[in-house]
Amino acid sequence: TLNDNGPKYINSSKTKIFDKSSTLYGINLAKEGISNSGKVVLVEGYMDALTAHQYGYDNVVACMGTALTESQVRYVSVLTKQCVLALDADIAGSEATFRSIENSWKAFERVFVGKKNNTSLYKTTNKIDLRIAQFNFGKDPDEIIRTDKNSWENHINNSKPLLAYLIENAPRRWNILSNEGKQLATENIAPLILSIDNDYDRENYYSQFATTLNVEINVVKSAVISANKKNSTKNVVSFN
C-alpha cells in the first residue's frame, strides 16, 4: 500500500489458489541461491525479497508475514538447515518481534520435534540453526539493501543465534535491575539453555546470561535449574 499510516501489504483472502501461510514469495528464484550459500534469509515483505534479488542476493525469500508457519518451515528445511530471520527495524526489539520469533521457533519445534515431544530442536539430529539479523531502527531490508549493501551483508553474516539474541535483548523485555525481572527472564530462557547438548556451548550461554543479569555464573546456573523445574509443563519458549 502507498499509505504510510496503514499496513505495508494487503493480501487477498485464503483461497484454493492462494494461501499466505503456505507461500514463500520468491522461492522459485531462490532455490539455487539457497543451495549454493547453505542458508536462507527470510524477510517479511514482497519488496524486501524483490530488492534483494535485484541486487544479487539470491537466497532471500519473503514469508509474507512476521512469523514462519509450519508449512513454510517444511519447505525451507528441505533446502537448508540454516535460517536467518531478517527483521524489519520498525518492529525489531518490540513485543511484535518477540512474538514473531516465538511463533517461528514453535513452528520449527512442531515440524522437527513433534507436538507431544518435550525435547528441543537443540537436541535433534536436524541441528536447525535459526539466527536473527537485527537492523538499525527505522530501516527495513529493502531500504538497507538499496542504500548500504555492506551493512546488509554484515548484518546477515553476523546474525546472532536465537538464544544469543534472546539473552542480549532480555533487558528490553524485563526489568532485570529487579530480582523479579531477573526471575522472569530466567524462567523464559532457562529451557533453551538446558536443552543445549554441547557442554561448552551451554557454559558459554550461562556466562552470557550471567553478564546480562549482572550476577555470578553459579547463581545463574542454580536459578536456571530451579526455573526449568517450575516451567516443566510449559513450552520450550514462553514469552510472558
Task: Write out the residue ranges for each language-model feature.
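Phosphate-handling DNA/RNA-contact segment within nucleic-acid enzymes
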Residues: 1-83, 95-100
